Amino acid sequence: MLYAFTLGRKLRGEEPSYPEKGGKGGADKSAKYAAEAQKYAADLQNQQFNTIMNNLKPFTPLADKYIGSLEGLSSLEGQGQALNNYYNSQQYQDLAGQARYQNLAAAEATGGLGSTATSNQLSAIAPTLGQQWLSGQMNNYQNLANIGLGALQGQANAGQTYANNMSQISQQSAALAAANANRPSAMQSAIGGGASGAIAGAGLAKLIGSSTPWGAAIGGGIGLLGSLF
């Protein structure tokens, strides 16, 4: 009679036709797919992080270089040295010569040669050109320093984002390791739950890879977390 009831339940689909040996096969596949998804996510984070860092790397030295240049121009001594170099440059000689010619031509046209006004205009050429050059240099240094500072800030932001995302991945990987450790399996029967957790954690750490120092550190952390379960 019991057999008849059992057969009826199987025919109605209330029970499987053949008893399953357990969910080990499906669970193993699920764990494998989950680990592959974690690896893909970690690899993607590594690629994005490395791309950003490498793209910004050429610009980061500008910050140190041109902040130092600005510091040099912030003192009277530094400004004096810079202006002295400028006054001895061909650029200054050309601009000063052009300015003198224009002033003298205008004074000659108006009959003002030898006047105090003309003399004052000629004497103002050097300090005017010097201050214009110095102001332009400081603006250029500031702009270049800002480019470097922006690159450094971009790297810092990328590092923070990378750390946050990899922290989430490591937590998910640790949860996966815990689930694998707590799931009955042939491996656990053989070596025990604690050792299984350690193996799972070490495997996930390997999946993370070490394409960046961050990835290596987080991968090591995943192995440590996995060994706790």
UniProtKB/Swiss-Prot annotation:
Domain of life: Viruses
GO biological process: symbiont genome ejection through host cell envelope, short tail mechanism
Record's GO cellular component terms: virion component
Membrane-spanning residues: none
Keyword list, A-Z: Late protein, Viral genome ejection through host cell envelope, Viral penetration into host cytoplasm, Virion, Virus entry into host cell
Principal subcellular localization: virion
Propeptide residue range(s): 1-20
Localization terms from the record: Virion
Family classification: Belongs to the podoviruses gp7 family.
Subunit structure: Interacts with the internal virion protein gp20; this interaction forms a tube-like structure that may allow DNA ejection through the host membranes.
Functional note: Inner capsid protein that plays a role in viral DNA ejection into the host cell. Assembles into an extracellular trans-envelope channel completed by the internal virion proteins gp7 and probably gp16. This channel allows the delivery of the viral genome into the cell cytoplasm. Displays membrane-association properties, may therefore form a simple channel spanning the outer membrane.
Name of this protein: Internal virion protein gp7
Lineage: Viruses, Duplodnaviria, Heunggongvirae, Uroviricota, Caudoviricetes
